[in-house]
Amino acid sequence: MKILNNKNTLSLQMLYAGYHTAGKEWCYNNVISPFSRMYLIDKGEAAVYMNKKKYNLSAGELFIIPKFTFHMYECDNFMYHYYICFFDQLIGGQSLFDNTEIHYQFPATEMDRMLMLRFLELNSDCAIQDPDPKTYDNIPDIYTVNQNKVNYSLNKEIESNGILLQLFSRFLGNTQLLESQSRNQYERLAKIFMYIDNN
C-alpha cells in the first residue's frame, strides 16, 4: 500500500551528517530535539534509552531516534558510527512518526552502508562540531543550519534527497498511514515548528 497520496507529500531536510568516534564521554541525559537522528553503527557498542526501553547498539545496525523523543546515551568504551540528523514533514498532514509503525533498530545491509557513504560524500561539510546535544539541537537557526554549505548541482541534490528517503524508508513498518494519534506530549509543539517553518 502507498504511504503517500496527493494530500500527503513527505519532505525530509538534512541538518547534520557525518562520522563520529564516540568514547566514554558519549553519555548525555534528558535529550529531546525537534529533529530525528539516524545511525549506522560501524564499530564498538553503546546504548540508547528511550520509550522506557534500553536499545543496545552494536556494529552493523541501523537505529533511529524520532524527533521529540526523550532519550539518553550511554557508552562504556567506544562506538564509531555514521549519522544523519533530519527533519521530516508530511505536507498536508503530520509527522510520519505519528502516523505509521516504526522499526527503531535492525541489521543494516551492504546497500545501506553504500548509501550512507554516498550521502556523506555528497554532504561532506555538514558534521556536528561538538557532540554534546546541548550545543546544537535547539539553536535559534536550527531550520537553516548547514544550508549555506550544501551547494551542489540539481542532479546531486536530487540524489542526496533520494538516498535520505531510501534510508528512512527502511525504518517504516506498516506502510499504510495510521489514524493520527499523538505518540508523546510534544505533538502540539511539533505542529508549531512546522507552521513556523512553512510561513
Map each language-model feature to its residues.
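Phosphate-binding site recognition
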Residues: 110
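DNA-recognition element of transcription regulators
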Residues: 64
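Double-stranded beta-helix
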Residues: 89-107
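Ligand-binding loop in jelly-roll beta-barrel domains
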Residues: 67-92
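Short, locally clustered residues in the helix-turn-helix/winged-helix DNA-binding domain
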Residues: 42, 85, 120, 172, ...
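Generic protein-terminus/edge-of-domain signal
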Residues: 1-61, 69, 75, 102-103, ...
